[in-house]
């Protein structure tokens, strides 16, 4: 099969400069679904295109949940995330739990970058860079928060960021997202608001608050294409 899902356009040895924003998780999710089957039909392709599975959440939580201390591990947020199937379903609390925790952790890990952005044009490290970093670098000087006396570790940041969101009230994903299809005039009366829908920018059903798939198409080849 041949697939494309906004992933990187070339390998690391490509000799020329190019730029753009690339999505590292949707392409891998397509490969996941297609390699699980020897043959696929239209129904399977429909299911795949509507999938809310997040490979980002699966890979990040494999590290983050493992390093939670005993007190945090028994919190309702942690228990919910341990049972989660990593799908961003509309009525689920766990996608919101994960997003809040990962955002807090990302800001805590790269705090020196965030605090310098008013003076220097520094981009935020991509989420895949962050996940790859914590998978391969359990010990690094980047985990230390320079503004504190203590020398923090990866475990410290994961537990501190979890405690930071542990008292947050968690709403179902659709309520938290408040998905909207806005009219060109941006007038609410002409728009569709408060859509009860799942998905995330890193899943194949990449529905966000105001952006998402506008149409889907499946073509079945054969003697009578449809």
Tell where the protein language model's regions lie, with residue ranges.
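C-terminal/peripheral segments of proteins
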Residues: 1-74, 79, 83-226
């Amino acid at each position: 099969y041949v697939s494309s899902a906004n992933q990187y356009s070339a390998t690391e040895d490509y000799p020329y400069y190019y730029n753009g924003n690339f999505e590292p998780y949707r392409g891998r999710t397509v490969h996941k679904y297609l390699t699980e089957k020897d043959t696929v039909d239209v129904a399977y392709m429909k299911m795949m295109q509507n999938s809310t599975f997040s490979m980002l959440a699966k890979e990040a939580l494999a590290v983050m949940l493992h390093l939670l201390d005993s007190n945090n591990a028994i919190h309702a947020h942690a228990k919910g995330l341990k049972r989660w199937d990593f799908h961003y379903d509309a009525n689920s609390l766990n996608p919101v739990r994960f997003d809040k925790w990962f955002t807090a952790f990302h800001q805590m890990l790269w705090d020196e970058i965030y605090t310098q952005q008013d003076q220097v044009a520094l981009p935020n490290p991509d989420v895949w860079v962050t996940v790859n970093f914590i998978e391969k670098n359990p010990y690094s000087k980047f985990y230390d928060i320079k503004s504190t006396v203590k020398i923090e570790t990866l475990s410290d940041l994961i537990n501190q960021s979890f405690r930071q969101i542990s008292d947050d009230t968690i709403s179902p994903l659709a309520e938290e997202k408040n998905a909207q299809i806005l009219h060109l005039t941006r007038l609410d009366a002409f728009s569709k608001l408060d859509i009860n829908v799942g998905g995330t920018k890193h899943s194949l059903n990449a529905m966000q608050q105001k952006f998402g798939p506008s149409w889907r198409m499946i073509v079945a080849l054969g003697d009578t294409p449809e």
